[in-house]
Structures are given as C-alpha cells and as structure tokens.
C-alpha cells in the first residue's frame, strides 16, 4: 500500500511556474528586468539563454542536497541574481564568505542595492548591528515631540522585542518552575533598554551599556529595604512605562530580585567580547523599516572554525523577523516590500529559537524563507522531530539537489 504522493512530471512542472528568460547580462545593464518577484525553482535550457521556472507566490522553500552537489552555485546564486533583478530585499547566511564576495559588489553596483555585511569572522571589518537602533530612533522622536504617542508606542514595542529576543536566545522559552524569573528578567531587560535609549548619550546607546547598567544595579544599596534597581525606578515619573515593564521585578523580595538581575546578566554575558563589541556598539547599517522599504542585501558571514559567535546569527535573524512582523502589522498585515531570508546551512548553525513560528506566520506577510540543508536529519537534530515536521509542512516547495 502507498499514498497518493508522487514526483511531478516535466509537463506539470512547466505548467505550474512562470517562464522567465534568465538573462543576467541584460539585467545588470538594466534591460529586460523581470516584473514578477519570486523564487527560482528550476530551469529549461535554450540555445541562447536558459528559461527560469519561477514560483511567484508567497511560499517557503526547503532545499536539500548533500555537501558538494552545488547548492550554493546552482541554486542560491541564481536565486540571488533573480532577487536582485526583481528588487527583493534579502538576508543571506554565508558560512564561507563566498556569497558576499561573489554577489556583494554585483548587488551594489549593478542593481543599486544597499549592501550590508555582518562579518562575524572579522568583526572589526563588519558593518554595525546595534540592537537598540530602532528603539533609540523613536526615543529621539518622542523626546523631540512629547505629543508623538506613535513614536512612544514604537519605542516601547521594539524594546520588548529586543528583550524577548535576548532572553529566548539561550533557551526554548519553556522554563517550567523558573518561568517567573525569566519573565521578570525579560521585563527588567526591556525597562533597562528603554532607559539606555532614552537617557544615554547617542554613542552609549548599545547593548553593552545595558549590561553595565544592570551590573551596577547589582551593587549593594545604602538604603535599607531597597535595592539599587528600586531606587533608580523611583526617580522616574509614576506613569513611565519602564516602571510598568519592570513591575514584576520591582515588587519582589531582595533575594528574588537578585535572581532576576542575575538571570538577565547571564543572557547578556555572551555580548561581552572585544571583537563583537565592534559591531554591537555602533550605528546599525540596516533596520527592519529600511530593509523592507529599500532594496537591501544583508549578508551574515559565519566563521565555520569558531561556533561561539553563532548565537548572534540566531539573534539577528530573530530580531529582524520580529521587527518585520511589527512593520507588516502597521501596513495592514503585509510588508511594504517583499523580503526573503536565504538560510544557507540552516542545519549547521545552532537552533534558531521560534523558527517554527517564523515558517508558520511569515509567508502571509510577504516574507519568504528558503532553508538550505544537507539532509532532513539535520533539522531533526536541531529542532526535534516535531519541529522539523512543522518546517517541512510549511514549505510549499521542496527541492532535492544531486
């Protein structure tokens, strides 16, 4: 006995997708640019040029191919070329640095893209990625116009997104009996992020300042019955949202408060690295709002030989995704411009927390995800059988290379 699943015939494949002449030489001169955005899923050889088979729908794709079959050269590169020609903003994970070397200059000079390189192999030569960028932007707008409640609301929302991303970066989000401490740490972290964005000078608005402030708040207090954090919060107006966000941590005993502060510190410890500070402490070269409104190519180069920085890849993807969903919600549930995440070697990098939800929720909002793996077993190892199945079920396209 067997089910009804089968391989598609050549005729069915040709009828299911758009046929677009794949002419990168003309595209790079600004000629015959494709009008339909989408993913390249195959090609038909012609005498003078190939015809690309393009799925123009909002779809996710799972590309499976063993090491050495040409996943990057024969699948990723044509898709990046087509994305550039059709004006889609993209995020690309790059384990060897080959992708940005081969396509960074082309995207910038031939297609007019804003190219951003997050280089975790050589952080001192990387573009900046300040996690507090959007929070600081709206803090300044609100400070300039206290009646601008929209900017105030955005500042608070992005602060909560940043805090949630950092807290969940180290675990699944299911903390059992310790959930109180992690939830409280998330609120405390959001409050501290808001304080840094609102009151620090521009050059000090970054995640390392958040770490230093929490570290100082751990110091013993001279006021009996109050810790340093409570004293700091009392200096704020009663209606300040930082006091509200930190409410669970403020109204607790001294020992519990220290545990909450320590939990937040443990999540921030990973950021204390002299090299990583070079990209975390300076202005961001890109944020979610620019990413979806301007043609942008964000390349993340990951050091294969040093997995200690891989957590930052997960963090960048999570934060950009959450911020993009916020932008989509403000535009009627759809991003102003289509975007795609090309997650090359998704099975090699550590688990990206909440990726199952990303695959479930992103598609209808105009964000496509392309997961490139060496085998399904890699997904099961990182996300478990259930998580791997969710990812597979949410990929409308599955392509095997070999």
Where are these regions (language model features)?
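P-loop NTPase motor domains
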Residues: 40-48, 52-367, 382-383
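Conserved ATP-driven motor cores of ASCE-family P-loop NTPases powering translocation/secretion/packaging/pilus
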Residues: 359-402
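N-terminal pre-Walker A segment at the start of P-loop NTPase domains
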Residues: 18-52
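Long, basic/Gly/Ser/Thr-rich N-terminal segments
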Residues: 1-16
